[in-house]
Amino acid sequence: MRHALLEGQRDIVLLLARVLLMILFVLAGWGKLTGFEGTVGYMTSLGAPVPTLAAAVAVIMEFVVGILLILGFYTRPLALLFALFVLGTALIGHPFWSMVDPERSANMTQFLKNLSIIGGLLALAVSGPGRFSLDKG
C-alpha cells in the first residue's frame, strides 16, 4: 500500500527521469555547438588550457552523451561519466568559495544544483534505464 502510487510505473518514471535530467544539457550543448566560437571564448575566459578542446568536450558531453542518456544507451557507464563531467563543471565553472556576493550566492546555487544533478545521475547509474531504453538489461 505504501508504494501504490508508483506501482508498476518504474519504467515510465525512469524514462521521465532520463528526459528531465538531460534536457537542460542537451539544449545547452546545442547552444554550445551552434555558437561554437562563443563557447571557445567562454572556455578561454575560464582559463581552460586548451579552450577549443574544452569546448568540444562540453559539446560532446552535453549534446551527444545527453541524447544517448535520454535514449537509454550505455546508461550506467555514461551516467557515471556524466556525473564526473558535471562535478568538473561545478568545480571549474562555479568556484563560489573564491567570490563575493552577489556573484558568490548565484554561483553557490549553481554549484549546489550541479551536486543535485550528480545525485540523480548516480541514482540512474544504480537503477539502470528501465525497459524503455536502447540498453538490453
Language model: regions and residue ranges:
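Extended, low-polarity transmembrane helix blocks
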Residues: 1-34, 44, 52-60, 64-137
